[in-house]
Amino acid sequence: MKIAECMTQEVEIVTPDQPIREAARFMLRADAGIMPVSEGDRLVGMVTDRDIAVRAVAEGRGPDTPVREIMSGDVLYCFEDDEVEAVALKMSDAQVRRMPVLSRQDETLVGIVSLGDISRSEQSEAASIALDGITDPGGERSQSE
């Protein structure tokens, strides 16, 4: 099964120049802890509620701070034609719960996949594999803790 068959296609994004206040409002409205940061059609980063609450606040940054100043620029992603099990393993290895999905053709953002999406798919055992890896101590934890 391809990841495109279980990913969420309608994804809210923020731009690097938007203030973190707007990113936080989007997250609150969408009940999401992570948002892709896009410049035009290109994914340039991810911003998490943790980036806003911990990094920005700890550094004394205000609500008008541009997202680019606190986002993670080293983004792990998958392609829409990747197999669900392969993506679950990638999520497990990196210890992330969500991953942006790009088009292989032009590398534009086409969706986001979460453990919940995978668990509701026909490949629900892949979610168990990912969850086991995510809950193990260690790993990269670069996008969502």
Task: Show the residue positions of the predicted features.
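Bateman/CBS regulatory modules and CBS-like beta-alpha motifs in cytosolic regions of diverse proteins
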Residues: 1-26, 32, 37-38, 43-44, ...
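Generic alpha-helix initiation/capping and coil-helix boundary signal
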Residues: 16-17, 49, 120-123
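Cyclic nucleotide-binding regulatory domains
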Residues: 44-48, 52
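A short, polar/charged loop-to-alpha-helix boundary motif
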Residues: 53-65, 118-132
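Hydrophobic alpha-helical segments characteristic of transmembrane helices
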Residues: 110-112, 116
